[in-house]
């Protein structure tokens, strides 16, 4: 017979690193070119004028200006714009 108990095992004990997603700059706020506006998975927000989209769907400002959010179209698509100053 075994003189020691067998070691227990667990199937939990893992967690993923936080991804820091969300809106980083809000409507009416001034941004400089290259500033990140939204970090997202998929296109919850779409790029409007003067806004670019990175390969991970991050939205960023292409020019210095003021941010505005708008709901466009029949599908109520949320779009982000930057109005140059």
From Swiss-Prot:
What GO terms describe the biological role, i.e. biological process, of this protein?
translation
What GO molecular function annotations does the UniProt record carry, in alphabetical order?
structural constituent of ribosome
Quote the biased-composition stretches of kind Gly residues, using this chain's numbering.
Answer: 1-10
* UniProt keyword annotations, A-Z: Ribonucleoprotein, Ribosomal protein
The UniProt entry's GO CC annotations, sorted and at most eight, read: cytosolic large ribosomal subunit
**Pfam families, alphabetically?**
Ribosomal_L27
Region spans: Disordered? 1-21
Q: Which InterPro entries match?
A: Ribosomal_bL27, Ribosomal_bL27_CS
Q: Which domain of life is it from?
A: Bacteria
- What PANTHER family does UniProt report for this protein, alphabetically? LARGE RIBOSOMAL SUBUNIT PROTEIN BL27M, RIBOSOMAL PROTEIN L27
Q: Which HAMAP family match?
A: Ribosomal_bL27
Report the family membership: Belongs to the bacterial ribosomal protein bL27 family.
Q: What is the protein name stated in its UniProt record?
A: Large ribosomal subunit protein bL27
**Gene name as annotated:** rpmA
């Amino acid at each position: 017979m075994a003189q020691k108990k067998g070691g227990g095992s667990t199937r939990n004990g893992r967690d993923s690193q936080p991804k820091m997603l969300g809106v980083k700059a809000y409507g009416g706020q001034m941004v400089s070119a290259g500033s990140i506006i939204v970090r997202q998975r998929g296109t919850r927000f779409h790029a409007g004028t003067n806004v670019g989209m990175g390969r991970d769907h991050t939205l960023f400002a292409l020019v210095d200006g003021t941010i505005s959010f708008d709901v466009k179209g029949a599908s109520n698509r949320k779009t982000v714009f930057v109005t140059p100053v």
